[in-house]
Amino acid sequence: MAQMRIKDIAAEAGVSPATVSRYLNNRPGQMTEETRARIAAVIERTGYRPRAAARNLRSSRTNLIGVILADIANPFSSAMLEGLSSSAAARGCSLMTAISGNDPAKEAESLARLIDAGVDGLVVNTCGGNDEAIVAAAGRLPVVLLDRDVADGGIDLVTSNNRELVAGLVDALAAAGSERLCLLTEASDDSPVRRERAEAFAEELSRRGLAGEVVTLADGGATGVGRLDEAIRGYAGKKLGLIAVNGLVFLRLTEALAQLGPSLPAGLKIATFDDYPWNHVLFGGVTTAAQDTLAIAERVVERLSERIDVVTTTVGEAAKLAPKRIEVPGRIEHRPSTSR
């Protein structure tokens, strides 16, 4: 009799090969008892045994980590991918990476594809709109969220201390004499990080009695320039301070300011999130809330490894590892853009 394979077991049990794989991995998720019983009966009747080189039982691993990133065009994402790769390699693991392009449908497809590929765990930098799918995935295998949370998911999250960093940037602009502040953000509000920073910004303005608003820069073209010009003209005669909510928005801000040119008010101060080489050059050096991307990546892989260890060594213990929100401290790099 020919060697039985997973697809043969699946055909006889009337299920997909992925379902058989989850059964063999002790990751049943929402699999019914009836489905489990059918698979078990076929395995017992055929005497199926996975080949040693290919089996994915609890006692062994694929050493593959699935990574889903929302926007590779964001410099934060490319820096994070490098850090995740290094941290995973140090533990003998490789990455399988998917880019959703801020498309919830692509993100959902990536979740399913990576799970079916047999990764040991998932790192998800969600674009939003897939909370239920991500929570369901976390019921099937270890998941750690990168930078962006989901609602009521009870899933580990590793992020920066965003509220403290916002306060630090407001401090820098206030000390530089700014009388009105604008937080520049993107059109979409799907990012929990951008929402958290906007909320923290509003709280800081209220606490300090400062005037300001959140301004949307839709893109680096005419729309973004026009909106910024409106904000600047609305604060005529006031010393204005601008904060870019992330590195991508900062690049859009830089383009918009270049187009506005001579109409810029005297004493304009600028600060941003995300520290990249151009921050040291543009505007004579830009005061920056620098996230520790390497430390964030290390903590993500470390936490995911802890969950994988539990799943692969102790039956039923995964749920006992309580979810954590891990905030990795960033720092404020003070530069000439906020000097008096």
State the predicted function of each range:
Residues 169-208, 316-337:
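An alpha-beta-alpha
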Residues 1-62:
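N-terminal helix-turn-helix DNA-binding module of bacterial transcription factors
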Residues 233-340:
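Flexible loop/turn connectors
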Residues 156-183, 222-230, 291-312:
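Hydrophobic alpha-helical segments within soluble ligand-binding/sensing domains
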Residues 33-37, 46-113, 117-120, 199:
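Amphipathic helical "hinge" segments at domain boundaries
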Residues 124-168, 188, 248, 274-286:
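Flexible loop/hinge segments that line or gate small-molecule binding clefts
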Residues 38, 76-90, 165-169, 192-211, ...:
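Short, solvent-exposed amphipathic alpha-helices that sit
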Residues 88-99, 180-184, 198, 202-223:
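Short beta-strand elements in bilobed, periplasmic/extracellular small-molecule ligand-binding domains
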